[in-house]
């Protein structure tokens, strides 16, 4: 089992009283690599409010504060030369915010800088403020799936080293390529794993047809996830693809400690570190449901169950809102506990 972790890159990710800086992200990335995580991930929102996750609005404002984020692709490019082996991933890019040719060119550059360590995740988009800030309206789900399909067609062709001429309903390109004329071979510099985030039936058909991997997050119970895996397998059968060739990663909120007493103390600390309102009304017992929560031995049992459902990588989120991390010692604590859990469950790489 590979282990990934979310990186802090929103203003609320560490200390919501001050803006996030790249030095904060770099420090967290180094801590993640040092403790043995296999991958680090950033997301893609122009801004994010915490109302969806229980956050409280400012007392003098009529709406939730809009927390700013560092750009994901620029951040990964900057992290590439200061890390060594860890995978650098997007979880996930909003397909509508960049033309696929530009996405491919940037991804190819980051892959080159990092020595082939980029994992490119793409999604159909769900956060309406991203579209409003971009100056457009968020399309209905059907149109977003159609746009994602066209985007993936172009990316897949470019990553395969093909000369791309494409006229679609949403995207067009003529003569785009990542191939180099120097060596005469049709290929990009280094292979770039391409995965899709989401869980709907149509999205899983897009995964089966175009993607190397599939991700969904942040809370899932075993039965619900198993049903989604069955849908993925049906999609693979439709396109005559081996389901085992689809790399499954799963994002989960995570709290783990060696003993119940330590787990309770850890939960209390995460509540204290949370942005205002996010931890309100939460208790440890209810937080266990659908999340990677428990003692090291309990989490080992859960991870073994996820592995039996085809999960090859678990991406943990330390806090109670996406990409809320708290502090670097939280990263180190999670890394140490999760490696113990992998050993107990015989899931070490």
Task: Tell me the role of every PLM-derived stretch.
Residues 1-38, 119-121, 139-140, 153-156, ...:
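C-terminal amphipathic alpha-helical "assembly" element
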Residues 1-82, 192:
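N-terminal beta1-alpha1-beta2 module of alpha/beta enzyme domains
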Residues 52-64, 107, 258-273:
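Aromatic- and acidic-residue-enriched segments that line the glycan-binding/catalytic groove
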Residues 54-63, 130-139, 188, 281-285:
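Short glycine/proline- and charge-enriched loop/turn segments
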Residues 57-88, 147-154, 238, 330-349:
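Alpha-helix-loop-beta-strand connector modules within alpha/beta enzyme cores
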Residues 68-74, 198-199, 294-298:
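Short secondary-structure boundary/capping elements
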Residues 88-97, 249-256:
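Conserved strand-turn element in the central/C-terminal portion of the radical SAM core barrel
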Residues 90, 96-210, 230, 243-244, ...:
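Internal, glycine-rich beta/alpha segment that forms the wall or movable "lid"
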């Amino acid at each position: 089992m590979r282990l990934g972790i979310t990186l802090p890159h929103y203003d609320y990710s560490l200390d919501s009283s001050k803006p996030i800086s790249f030095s904060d992200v770099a420090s967290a990335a180094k801590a993640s690599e040092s403790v043995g995580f296999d991958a680090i991930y950033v997301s893609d929102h122009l801004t994010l409010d915490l109302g969806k996750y229980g956050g409280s609005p400012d007392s003098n404002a009529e709406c939730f504060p809009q927390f700013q984020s560092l750009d994901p692709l620029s951040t990964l490019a900057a992290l590439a030369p200061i890390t060594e082996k860890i995978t650098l991933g997007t979880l996930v890019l909003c397909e509508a915010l960049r033309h696929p040719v530009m996405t491919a060119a940037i991804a190819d550059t980051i892959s080159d800088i990092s020595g082939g360590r980029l994992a490119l995740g793409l999604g159909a988009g769900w956060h309406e403020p991203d579209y409003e800030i971009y100056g457009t309206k968020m399309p209905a789900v059907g149109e977003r799936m159609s746009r994602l399909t066209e985007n993936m067609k172009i990316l897949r062709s470019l990553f395969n080293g093909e000369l791309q001429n494409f006229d679609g309903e949403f995207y067009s390109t003529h003569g785009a390529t990542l191939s180099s004329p120097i060596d005469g071979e049709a290929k990009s510099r280094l292979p770039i794993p391409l995965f899709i985030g989401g869980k709907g039936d149509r999205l899983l058909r897009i995964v089966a047809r175009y993607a190397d991997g599939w991700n969904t997050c942040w809370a899932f119970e075993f039965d619900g996830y198993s049903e989604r895996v069955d849908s993925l397998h049906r999609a693979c059968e439709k396109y005559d693809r081996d389901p085992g060739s689809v790399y499954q990663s799963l994002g989960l909120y995570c709290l783990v400690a060696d003993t119940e007493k330590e787990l309770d103390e850890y939960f209390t600390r995460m509540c204290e570190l949370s942005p205002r309102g996010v931890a309100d009304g939460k208790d440890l017992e209810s937080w266990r449901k659908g999340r990677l929560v428990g003692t090291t031995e309990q989490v080992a049992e859960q991870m073994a169950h996820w592995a039996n459902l085809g999960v090859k990588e678990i991406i943990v989120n330390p806090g109670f809102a996406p990409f809320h991390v708290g502090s670097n010692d939280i990263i180190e604590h999670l890394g140490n506990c999760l490696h113990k859990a992998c050993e107990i469950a015989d899931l070490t790489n």
